[in-house]
Amino acid sequence: GKKPILVLREPSMGPVFGMKGGATGGGYSQVVPMEDINLHFTGDFHAITAANDLLCAAIDNHIYHGNELGIETVAFNRSLDVNDRALRHVSLEHRSEKFNITAASEIMALFCLADSLDDLKEMLGNIVIGYDKNQRLILAKELHIEGALVTLLKDAFYPNLVQTLEHTPAIIHGGPFANIAHGCNSIVATKLGLSLGDYVITEAGFGSDLGAEKFLDIKCRKASIFPECIVLVATIKALKYNAGISKEDILIENVDAVREGICNLEAHVSNLKKYGVPLVVCLNAYDTDTSLEQQVVIDWCKKENISVAVST
């Protein structure tokens, strides 16, 4: 009788059209409508792109009209939600520039760490846009641009509600990359989920040494929340790959390789135990797994007194 709800990140069109593909799941573990979520969705990324590039335009316009702030080095780049190699390095009239993908924009990270529009406005104003000849930090609010930026983002700041194929509600909002940002969905979406569901499930991009630590040390601190449980997802294929098995042989039963690869799982478990939160290892089962391979993981978890579940 308990109500679960998911709170997830939005896909970026760059990976969707690249090697990684979409970010709505697969099989029966999927949020829908897949094509709408992966492509444009509600336009949140476009609003963030527009705000990002408005700030860039204001910087260059300020320099053009006399540079009263004495900007010597610009430290804020343009963005676009497409993998466009030709725009990674471009030449402007008086300096070089580059485009980041929108998910890597500082505005995307701030968008997801703000708990209100006022909070977002303050953080936008504190973006470091450059340095003067004395290496003084120059902030966006010195251009008096933060009001315009937050106005562009006011509608995008509302979270988006969709559902899984099994009709579980899913709030999808924001999408900072985890390698250069904190890799978590927005705080406002997470708090909305907490107000509506009995169990709120979210994801933190990448493993315990990156996604989990950023979620716990950055997002949770900013939002004044903390998880009741951590789920560490493992697969037999990944464990064998960590043991050095080639992709060509990874679907062949290899119990010894699973045992050898468990050292990687052990390292992630060790990282997460430091937070003192109940931990569950979830073995994401595939039909290519064998019962003997799965049993290696189950037995190891029991030996280490770690709760384990097999997802089918």
Ranges and model annotations:
Residues 1-312:
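Flexible phosphate-sensing "switch/lid" loops adjacent to ATP/NTP-binding sites
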